[in-house]
Regions:
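Conserved loop->alpha-helix
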Residues: 1-180
Length: 180
């Protein structure tokens, strides 16, 4: 789709499944594919994200950087992925999906009931917390405009915890350690 590559310059930031990547090459085409956009992806990115699991033709969430004068829906995300979370269970209801995500123990303290979390780049509200991680409650609109509804049990989503929550918890823990 041309809108995705219009005015796309080298060095631009693009989020793929919520992971901020820098454009290093854009190839326009007259064929079925409008363009190919190239990024450098380093080992750390492959280890922390689901990008290494992608194959040619994989459906991804694609988002350009926010620009002044555009609506900002959800919470602010940076594209700096903290970890991945594996889908443990999917419950398909009449008008929504409930998805249980298994989150690494290290990151569970940063995910709060009714708090924000970025999942494959989608700004979402945490539905429930359990001992394994957390649940998402996804409405049809979210399922339609993201790749979250295409996922199956065992797939992994990129997770970026809310930066304010992360900063507050780490600041309090550091303070308590220094003053105990």
């Amino acid at each position: 789709n041309e809108q995705y590559v219009k005015h796309l310059d080298l060095g631009a930031s693009i989020a793929i499944n919520g992971c901020c990547l820098t454009v290093v090459k854009v190839e326009l085409s007259n064929h079925d594919v409008v363009a190919q956009v190239h990024f450098d992806v380093i080992d750390e990115t492959l280890q922390l994200t689901n990008l290494g699991q992608l194959e040619l033709g994989s459906l991804v969430n694609y988002e350009r950087s926010v620009s002044f004068g555009t609506e900002l829906g959800g919470h602010i995300v940076s594209g700096h992925i903290h970890c991945t979370a594996k889908i443990a269970q999917i419950v398909k209801l009449e008008n929504n999906y409930k998805i249980q995500l298994s989150l690494p123990q290290k990151w569970q303290k940063y995910v709060l009931y009714k708090g924000f979390v970025s999942v494959n780049g989608a700004s979402l509200t945490v539905g429930n917390i359990d001992e394994f991680g957390f649940w998402l409650h996804l409405i049809p609109e979210t399922l339609d405009i993201t790749n979250l509804g295409e996922a199956v049990v065992g797939d992994e989503f990129n997770i970026e915890v809310d930066q304010q929550t992360y900063t507050i918890i780490n600041t309090v823990e550091n303070y308590m350690r220094q003053h105990s």
